[in-house]
């Protein structure tokens, strides 16, 4: 049954590796409770997924997009471009922006102002790593 189904799917998704990815993703969705769009006929989830792709009840493009979204760990959000009027205002007041940056500098560089004694005390406080047989 599955061999005939795969041959029917090759017409819809030309790359067989992509077909495997799409069908396995759809089979996982079915096992998680997604509604199926064809009769089950006592078939397992991968065969049902292949039959759905072969019968074109699901779009391969939609499945591919859903697969990509399920694999993404960080989703980029399109931020609106800055308004040209606000850019003109920031260019008109560069002295104010420089003054604000100078005020922030001492707070950001406090970690660079350690004395030599503090650095030596920190180095002496480090614990050497334990030797292991890995190397």
UniProtKB/Swiss-Prot annotation:
It catalyses: RNA(n) + a ribonucleoside 5'-triphosphate = RNA(n+1) + diphosphate. It comes from the Bacteria. Keywords: DNA-directed RNA polymerase, Nucleotidyltransferase, Transcription, Transferase. One of its GO terms (molecular function) is DNA binding. InterPro entries: DNA-dir_RNA_pol_omega, Pol_omega/Rpo6/RPB6, RPB6/omega-like_sf. SMART domains: RNA_pol_Rpb6. One of its GO terms (cellular component) is DNA-directed RNA polymerase complex. Its EC number is 2.7.7.6. Gene3D superfamilies: 3.90.940.10. GO terms for biological process: DNA-templated transcription. The keyword Glycosyltransferase does not apply. The RNAP catalytic core consists of 2 alpha, 1 beta, 1 beta' and 1 omega subunit. When a sigma factor is associated with the core the holoenzyme is formed, which can initiate transcription. Belongs to the RNA polymerase subunit omega family. Promotes RNA polymerase assembly. Latches the N- and C-terminal regions of the beta' subunit thereby facilitating its interaction with the beta and alpha subunits. This is DNA-directed RNA polymerase subunit omega. It comes from Sinorhizobium medicae (strain WSM419) (Ensifer medicae). The gene is rpoZ.
